Amino acid sequence: MNRIMSLFAATLLGLLVGGAELLAQSGFEVKGVVNDAMGPVIGATVLETGTTNGASTGLDGDFILKVSSADAMVEVSCIGYATQTFKASELPSVITLAEDAMFLDDVVVIGYGSQKKKEVTGSVASVKAEDFNAGVKTSPVGLLQGKVAGLNIIRTTSDPTSTGFNVQIRGFSTLDKGAGTSPLYIVDGVPVSNIDNISPDEIASMDVLKDGSAAAIYGTRGTNGVIIITTKRGDNFSDAAQTRVEYSGYASLSMRNGDLGMATPEEFVNLETLSGGKVKPTIISDENGNYVLTDWMDELTRDVAVTHSHNVAIVGSSSKFNYRAAVAYKNAEGIAKNNNREEVIAKIAASQKALQGWLELQYDLSYMHYRNDYFCGDFKQAAILNPTTPIYDASQENGYYMPQGTGISNPVENMNQRESYQDGNYFRGSVKATVNIKPVEGLKVSGFAAFEEGDNHNFWYNKTINTDKDGSGKAGRGSDFNFSKLFELTADYSRTFGKHHFAAVAGFSYQNFLYDNSSIFNKGFPTEDMKYYQIGNGDAEKTYLTASSSRNSNTLAAGFGRVNYNYAEKYLVSASIRREGSSRFGVNNKWGWFPAVSFGWRITGEEFMEGKDWANELKLRAGFGVTGNNLGSDLRSVAMLSNGGTFWYNGSYVYTYGVSQNVNPDLRWEKKLEYNLGLDYAFLDNRIYGSLDLYYRQTRDLLWDYEVPTPPYQYPTLLANAGQMDSYGIELAISGVAVKRGDWTWTTTPTISFNRNVITKLSDPSKGFNYKQTTSGGVGENGIMNTNTQILIEGQSVGAFYGYKFLAIKDGNWYFKTPAGGVVDTSTAAEAYRQVIGNAQPLFTYGWNNTIRWKNVDASLFFRGVYGNDVLNLTRWAYGPRESAADNVFMKDITKKKTVYSNKALFTDYYLEDGSYIKLDNVTVGYTFNFKENSLVDNLRIYLTGQNLLTITKYSGQDPEVNTTSVWDAGIDYCDFYPTVANVQFGLNISFK
């Protein structure tokens, strides 16, 4: 956590905790100045212990506070400093705060509990709300982008109706598409399926469990890592009732800032000149030779898209009850026309003490309603459609021009003549009851019950009058329902005996999931008004009416335990184990063990480090843990039957069924064994601090669909465990107070991570599977090409591009190098000459956050990027130059001196481009106002933020930030795209007493 943002957070905290009761008090007045080694500390919190009565220091570090009596205890704190406590009558006039190395007393959530940061032995990164990314976020994971070394978050789209992010911790750990690479999300103790229903303004912290020793306590769901989200709650219990109101909101303007690389209308009509006579465009003109220039992208997009968001919270506390109730509203326009998302999120969190402290209760309830209006045009068609094609044609019944001979429909017509939207609701609730067993000091027993429920409803309609005849007059609707229930019982015990501290937790967990969906389609409606409202009134007697439904469920049950021990906060050890069963696995392998152990040694606590002022903190960590990967869907281990069509029998059609999946009673979870070695450090009076981690992973029993003989099998493929994959990496996070002079402070925080993986075994001959390689990364564009571009092969990593090694173009002929060093051309190139020609995985990823503060002004600049990866520019390959251009063309390979015709016959590294980039992802400037003690306003901050303002890259496509987290097609920039945008946002945060 950087120090300046910590000061800003402390300023907010100090202003928020000031109580309205302050004016009515006639107690004891304390005043003074708070300094550190460099001078006044701005934004330190001065708080009467046990209350919300407080003040914050001003520009000169000064404060005045009226407390209840001379005997009251007063805490002086600021994030990044050690807290000091004084009796009011003994509070000095000048208080000097000492910086707290890496905020060692900060609490880190580790799953089924929490620890002080200095006691953590696993690889865990904690990000507090004050350090989140600013700006418009379609998903809470965007708050973490670039903040945590080893956490790879890819922004895949600017469409507000999509989450827009793919998340991966420490690279690939599976080859199973169904299981995916996303981490497990825990929200306030509940494992959830969706975090997009959380208002970013209501998140207090996000803790990332990266290594196996930290994640093993989550068993079969811990392989991809865990992100624990803690939402905001009411203030601490206080004797005097306190209430405050908070508001945060912003308005944002978005504009296109990406270019796909296709010819503009002006370039298209001049292609013959620009290409040196090699490319002749087809100009669509009337009988008089007149033609129009149509910028199809402009026709489908807004000049400016507007988003506004508002969050109101009421926070209260008393001696036995506290609460936080919040309502958030957001309306986000997409840069595409007719594209919008609207959502309302409500949440209440409450805590209660009862039975003289024996019983503690926590209640959480949240609800979201949303509506997505989807874009029904097609940006790929807009990009490749001939720019001299008119939009309208008065001779057509619906007034739109029908493109001829291109296999492309009119994208403006589709946008205006079609509609598609989704709306839905989401509920999550939980209650936790904790009984403090007072006869046994440090022992408490908790019961936790939670539910999660979501329903989504989809509607779409294509109008009857449509030049795209195949899509005319059709409608559909579908619904899906998801429900899960969770029950947990835990016992916690914590005691300190002299220099020995012992903490343990043991528990049982049961979670059940239910999924239900249905859909129906029809066409041929009597009027346009019926569509999906009266879908049964379509042409049901003919062949188009289609209905389907499904219902599945699965269950997880587990017992778990963990023991933490430390001696004198120097020697640390943690051990955990989970025994878990999943109904998704085969009957012979439903249960498994997931152990973990980790150690820590705080070197700076040793006697030989006394007097070594250059080192404020040195802690070595070492850990080992086993995690699993639950199957991504139900019923994968049992035999399945599917509809095989119909045949005529005895005067009617009869449905047939056939085997579509083999039974596998031995199907089990993938198992990951992970070793981690880490160092937490702070040097030079805590001016430099951070962490270094090295890890090695072994993933065993990889899942794969293997080809099997029929008979004895009834279906030609079998999902089984046979493969192996290893990965390793280095993660470095550094925070440094680069400048601290007078009112100026500059904190810089770079992070960098290196990750490699290699498939060590794709199959197992002893089990009847003898695979060494298989191709993936399939691409196909309107019949132009249809091939696989990647390979999964033993000895290579995921994302290996597989094709022909480009050598040269001579007299229009393409030449390639063979693996043996020979040369072939297009006519003689054979499958045997294909080889690994690149990789979609970057050599390293990085982020760099900078925060500058001067008095009440704060500014931050955040950069992030990747280096060393290849991107397949499919648009360049499929729609590059050709002798006769009936459709639009990609311009990179067109010059007057040398125009290269696209080689659509073969995949070659000519079409792989350097995907490295650095982005100026976020720039924020803010100002925090000071208010007098008796002001109604506690806090007011205004800010201006710019997002995605600059990208430095060699890539010729719209955006080099393509998906690199997919097992099967990482690094492929498909022609289907949504325009990238830059955002400018104005916002404010205000709270009232």
Where are these regions (language model features)?
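Short, small/polar-rich motifs associated with maturation and membrane association
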Residues: 1-348, 353-354, 359-362, 368, ...
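Short aromatic-centered micro-motifs
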Residues: 46, 76, 185, 495, ...
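Extracellular/periplasmic, surface-exposed regions of secreted and cell-surface proteins
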Residues: 132, 182, 188, 305-308, ...
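Catalytic-site beta-strand/loop segments enriched in glycine and acidic/polar residues
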Residues: 184-187, 572-581, 818-841, 902
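Conserved small-residue
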Residues: 244-292, 519, 720, 737-840, ...
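Short Gly/aromatic-enriched secondary-structure transition segments
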Residues: 261-263, 462-463, 521-525, 765-766, ...
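Glycine-rich, aromatic-lined ligand/substrate-binding cores of catalytic
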Residues: 839-871
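C-terminal beta-barrel architecture of Gram-negative outer-membrane proteins
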Residues: 859-920
